[in-house]
């Protein structure tokens, strides 16, 4: 087989209460993914099916998603609610006008960056889910709970120092036994987290920007577009908090008009290329006044052509920061940050995974794990 690539917990002030709920759009009744649920200590997200588990440890729980009205509720009220929660949409944003380079509000964002984002060493507790699919079918699922230490949040890759302390892991995958089949490697921890830290400062020489559009009474949105047609400058948007000029949401994806111009790489009898990528991030303010990346999702699609067939690999890396700015003195790095993710080995802790509250396995994931043993021609790779 040929491979190619592209806690120490602070004491709680309140007794924890475990809650499982389902969140939908109040109008369409469709499930909402990536809804942020947090209290003073903990953060989590809804999964693709709209479900979440949450260990409440404070007196107020906030449930929020940009474009929807924020819901604040006590743990007791949340437990009394029915299984389904409804979020009501806010009014639709106004239409945009393209104005060119350097809108004033973006200049304000850059001037306030040192005030809004950590620029000295800090530690965060995180949960990372990695999913690899081949032609729409699951190949690998990996969930990691750990801690990350960085010298600063944003900057060029060469300027960011990053280490990891992994605490818990569960991974499950299947691998084709045919030695001539290809195997797509996942990114390393370092590479994934550097993607998350790379998109705040956009070069005015390379991008045009739309005029700000109103999202709600405290947020405006700016779209960005590459000035020149190339395959490495993407399109996307920034959502800006107009009270402190922080960025609360960022997105960037491949310029669809340039997909056909993306070059192919070749290795032996295989040629491949990244034909799609998308990065979405949401930022929150912590009690220390600094913003952190509360959640992020990086998706990639890789086309692979071998002698027998054409394959599409879809990869997703979903991040949740479960505790921002945690205790730095207890951080102990224990893994190689440059190692490929699925090659990392941390023993499976059944008790932890039965009680943890981050990104529940979707129905499709559970079916994949249950039925994988019935697939002929594949070997199973798992730590549980």
Question: Predicted segment positions?
Answer:
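Short, acidic Ser/Thr/Gly-rich low-complexity loop/linker segments typical of extracellular
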Residues: 42-51
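A short, solvent-exposed loop/turn motif at the edges and junctions
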Residues: 39, 63-73
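Short, ordered, surface-exposed loop/turn motifs in non-cytosolic proteins
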Residues: 19, 27-40
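A short, amphipathic beta-strand motif
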Residues: 19-26, 50, 85
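Surface-exposed, low-complexity/disordered segments
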Residues: 86-218, 263, 268-384
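Bacterial Sec-dependent N-terminal signal peptides
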Residues: 1-22, 384
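Short Pro-Gly-centered beta-turn/loop motif in secreted/extracellular proteins
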Residues: 53-60
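Extended beta-strand-rich segments in extracellular/periplasmic secretory proteins, especially
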Residues: 195-254
């Amino acid at each position: 087989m040929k491979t190619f690539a592209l806690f120490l917990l602070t004491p709680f002030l309140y007794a924890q209460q475990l809650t499982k709920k389902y969140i939908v759009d109040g109008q369409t009744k469709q499930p909402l993914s990536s809804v942020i649920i947090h209290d003073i200590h903990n953060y989590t997200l809804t999964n693709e099916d709209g479900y979440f588990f949450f260990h409440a440890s404070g007196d107020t729980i906030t449930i929020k998603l940009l474009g929807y009205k924020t819901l604040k509720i006590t743990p007791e009220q949340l437990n009394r609610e029915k299984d389904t929660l409804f979020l009501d949409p806010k009014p639709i944003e106004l239409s945009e006008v393209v104005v060119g380079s350097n809108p004033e509000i973006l200049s304000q964002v850059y001037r306030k960056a040192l005030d809004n984002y950590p620029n000295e060493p800090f530690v965060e507790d995180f949960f990372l889910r990695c999913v690899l699919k081949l032609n729409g079918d699951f190949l690998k699922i990996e969930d990691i709970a750990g801690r990350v230490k960085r010298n600063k949040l944003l900057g060029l890759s060469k300027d960011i120092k990053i280490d990891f302390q992994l605490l818990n892991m569960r991974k499950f995958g299947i691998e084709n036994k045919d030695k001539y089949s290809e195997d797509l490697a996942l990114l390393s921890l370092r590479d994934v987290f550097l993607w998350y830290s790379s998109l705040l400062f956009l070069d005015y020489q390379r991008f045009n920007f739309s005029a700000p559009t109103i999202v709600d009474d405290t947020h405006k949105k700016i779209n960005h577009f590459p000035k020149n047609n190339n395959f490495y400058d993407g399109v996307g948007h920034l959502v800006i908090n107009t009270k402190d000029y922080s960025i609360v949401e960022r997105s960037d994806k491949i310029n669809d008009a340039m997909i056909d111009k993306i070059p192919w790489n070749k290795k032996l009898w295989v040629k491949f290329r990244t034909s799609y990528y998308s990065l979405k991030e949401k930022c929150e303010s912590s009690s220390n006044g600094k913003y952190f990346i509360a959640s992020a999702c990086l998706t990639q699609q890789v086309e692979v052509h071998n002698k027998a067939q054409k394959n599409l690999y879809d990869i997703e890396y979903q991040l949740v920061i479960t505790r921002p700015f945690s205790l730095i003195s207890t951080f102990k790095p224990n893994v190689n940050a440059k190692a490929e993710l699925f090659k990392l080995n941390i023993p499976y802790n059944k008790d932890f995974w039965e009680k943890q509250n981050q990104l529940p396995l979707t129905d499709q994931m559970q079916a994949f794990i249950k039925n994988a043993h019935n697939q002929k021609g594949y070997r199973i790779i798992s730590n549980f």
